[in-house]
Amino acid sequence: MASVQSACIRFLLSRANLWNKPIAEIRESLKKVKPQGIPSGVSEEFAAINGVGCKVMIPAEGLNNKAILYFHGGGFCLGIYHPNREFAARMAKKCGVKVFMPNYRLAPENPFPAALEDAMAVYKGMLLEGYSAGNIVAAGDSSGCGLLLSALLAL
């Protein structure tokens, strides 16, 4: 009889090809995910920060001099989709600050260091817009965290 661990591994390996599709097809599939919406008390805007498009989640009440710079995950090849927006909106509401989500250039169309250049441009743009470095909290998930660490090393 197989162990529980080997049964789990066999199950996971049998599903390994779920993401083995062309990137364009995966992107289209993600667009079809039904959004849960953003919480009340948060609005969403699009802004160009230093030439890079960003989704900005704005809490109805909060601090105007502090912000979160949040880099979404997605293997550097998937854009901002509903779960990212919803998470950023909840962060904005809970923390009471704007959350900036750069729509950084994606691979493979834009190879490294394109995403890093966009991340740095948004950070520098936030400084130019009056945020002090000490009032910007950087966050990320999955590959977004890798992008964040790369940006910190580049500073």
Language-model regions, residue ranges each:
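A glycine/proline-hinged amphipathic helix-loop "lid/cap" segment
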Residues: M1-G62
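Short strand-loop-helix active-site module centered on a catalytic nucleophile
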Residues: C54, L69, M91, F112-L155
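Short beta-to-alpha linker loops that shape the active-site pocket of alpha/beta-hydrolase fold enzymes
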Residues: N103-A107
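Serine-hydrolase catalytic-loop signature spanning alpha/beta hydrolases and amidase-signature enzymes
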Residues: G75-L78, P83, V99, G125
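A generic structural signal for alpha->beta connector loops
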Residues: G41, G51, G96, A133-N135
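Short amphipathic alpha-helix adjacent to the substrate-entry channel of hydrolases
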Residues: H82-P102
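Short beta-strand element of the alpha/beta-hydrolase
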Residues: N65-G74
